[in-house]
């Protein structure tokens, strides 16, 4: 690793992510925000590695992921299982072929890294870590590497050599890394990095007033993630409102204008349905929620843990999403529904069971770890700030 104490220039940290799914970029932004509060003598840059790959590769990589998650979940899950090996140190022949191919499309990215000359590289996605690790082995790069894993059950694709330290969202993840030959001294169970705003108290009365939410109803939040894989949202909305007359349903529609229009025409009584377009204040809404109906994305569920909000996880896609869901359900912070049609009835059951909601909320708070703060402290220590 470059020694920043031997130079008068600010220490340089490169946060490497990939714009496939929202969680990896959110994690990188959270760390960048935390580092921004740390020191003015620090140069931090975030790069989307996919933006520095050929257009055809970017289209296949992102498009394949989106298609699998939204249209072909079983095929996606099968591919996930077939590539999740070997569970031991070293590389299998198939892995070496895959990594060689990836190095070919990462040449522009590799040049960018060399030009930036970072003291430390922090990865929130697995694509580029092996390539940079090989550059370190060959003496072309002297920066250290940190890896921030964003799944509770990490896939073999996360494995890489020449990683100084690993940060995991949950203790359950550590067992898999040790099987890959990663020493326990290089593993920290930090929790998922989320924006520091999730750690700030939000007065309930102010949030209700600002968002014009009723104070006499439970708030249920429905979101389908960035690709809206949470089932037929409008149909779910209508059925939930039919079964649960004493709730206010907040639907996070993001930038989906078509969905916003359909929700606006849903004909719900005032105060019962609140469609929300894209906002960076979701933490306020979640803080007053009694239940979050969502997909089991790593960062999304970590935000719910920070807010202490029970989760109803809908039809987890086989793979990392299913792994996240199993972990949360096993620890009593979430309930899984494998069928969209069961979601409204499950919401009704939970709304009528205060004891179950309180227990889910308590378990969620107990699982939360302040990942951003832990990772930022480790970065500062590594750079001797």
Briefly describe each language-model feature range:
Residues 287-297:
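Acidic donor-binding loop of glycosyltransferase active sites
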Residues 30-112:
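Conserved N-terminal ligand/cofactor-binding loop architecture of enzyme catalytic domains
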Residues 367-385:
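C-terminal alpha-helical cap of glycosyltransferases
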Residues 330-331, 339-355:
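C-terminal "capping" alpha-helix adjacent to the active site of nucleotide-linked donor transferases
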Residues 27, 78-181, 186-189, 195:
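Active-site and donor-binding regions of nucleotide-sugar-utilizing enzymes
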Residues 164-226, 255-256:
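A nucleotide-sugar donor-handling region in carbohydrate enzymes
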Residues 204-206, 211-288:
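Donor-nucleotide binding loops and adjacent catalytic segments primarily
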Residues 356-369:
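A short, well-ordered alpha-helix in the C-terminal region of glycosyltransferases
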